[in-house]
Amino acid sequence: MKESSLKAKTAKGLFWGGVGNGLQQLFNLFFGIFLARLLDASDYGMIGMLAIFSAISSVIQEGGFGAALINKEKITQEDCNAVFWFSLSAGFCLYILLFLSAPFIAGFYGIPELAPLSRFMFLGFLIGCTGTVHGAIFTKRLMIKEKIHINLIALFCSGCIGLAMAYCGMAYWAIATQQVSYMLLMVSMLWYKSPWKPTLQFSAAPLKEMLPFSIKIAFTNIFNQINQNILTVLMGKYYTSRQVGYYTQGNKWMMMGSSLVTSMVTNVAQPVLIQVSSEVERQKNVFRKMLRFVSFISFPAMLGQIGRAHV
């Protein structure tokens, strides 16, 4: 019974993950095409220059503790409170630091407009830190369908806001507001739908317990974000914002296909593998099945791309 229940949850999670990520990519495609017609490449370039600061700050404030919560067999109110207050405190401190550093960031790129833009954009990760625990709980409980609904609503509403502002000539502020409003809407709905709410109690003991696992995740994610964004920083320093915009947009469209498969699997893999962590052979079997599933989707897609390529 337990085996069939896990299979059903996994299949349901993969199904909704696939449907949700597919719709998400369609929304991104729709809004991306219309925004590209209303905005200049330099607007995207200015947003891209700031991406590394938001991305690394988001990783640091989360500290790998979101993944650590998912990794625990059972989580308590004390665990969730510890991660929530750590994430909120770290996020607030990082925002203050980046707020004060905004003129230096603008000076590094030689674009004064980046100072007020960065201070507004960095609100996104500050808002995001209040939803770290709620998102982890949704993933741990394999509430993929509910999470997808929230994500799609936030994506659609924020996309409409971005389009309206771009139509009114707000340039790069349209993209920045789209990103911040997306985070605000998503976190608000996570709070509304989540069965967990924080309390004022705090203990550092759960953080110490999870630290050996979370620190590895945090460092991995930091290096991953540096690897993904360092070229944009260098281009922003030595090239124009328009050229950076062409690069960031091209890279974004290139990554859409691969992110469709990876996001679908990663949202399900960790919580499922944790449920069978006490049974090594069963865990290996689950991993093999997920690997076959990814191969079943990825290999035909890659062969199709090879067939379409011009010789």
Language-model regions: role of each:
Residues 6-65, 90-102, 154-163, 178-186, ...:
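Signature of the first transmembrane helix
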Residues 1-29, 67-70, 74-85, 114, ...:
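N-terminal membrane topogenesis motif
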Residues 1-6, 10, 145, 188-233, ...:
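Interhelical loop/hinge segments that connect adjacent transmembrane helices in multipass membrane
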Residues 115-122, 150-195, 212-213, 220, ...:
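Hydrophobic alpha-helical transmembrane segments
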Residues 56-57, 96-100, 110-137, 148-156, ...:
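Alpha-helical transmembrane segments of multi-pass membrane proteins
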